From Swiss-Prot:
One Gene Ontology cellular component annotation held by this UniProt entry: cytoplasm
Cofactors, names only: Zn(2+)
Keywords tagged on the record: Cytoplasm, Metal-binding, Zinc
Residue sites binding Zn(2+) per the record: H64, H68
Superkingdom in the source lineage: Bacteria
The protein, known as: Protein SprT-like
Family: Belongs to the SprT family.
NCBIfam families: PRK04351.1
Amino acid sequence: MKLTDYVKQVSLEDFGRPFIHHVQWNRRLRSTGGRFFPKDGHLDFNPKVYQKLGMEVFRKIVRHELCHYHLYFQGKGYQHKDRDFKELLKAVDGLRFVPSLPNSNSKPLKLYRCQSCQQRYQRKRRIDTKRYRCGLCRGKLLLINQPED
């Protein structure tokens, strides 16, 4: 997929207006699907959103960024707080927030339980059960599930 051609196509189909600036992938984006730069008019998109969430979600993110783009160059309110932006975003069925990306490097949690009071503890890191005790009753901790690494 050629990103620039795709954004131009979405702009014409959904907004009826041409997109004439630069578009690029930006791997450094973490918690956002895309960015609009008013200074020079270019757009950045997160490639992980396209790869992991699919074309349908990515198209809605492109619409979101194009809302910023077209409203800015029309001299209307282009920020998230502006009524013009909210109305246009709703009209073109764009996403307000990017869905959470599946995190491939998240470790499964280890689950511990106190043998006396049955209090449960979830931890990312291993607890030395010979050294540490329950914070409520000082009972011994027992590892319930050991996830496969």
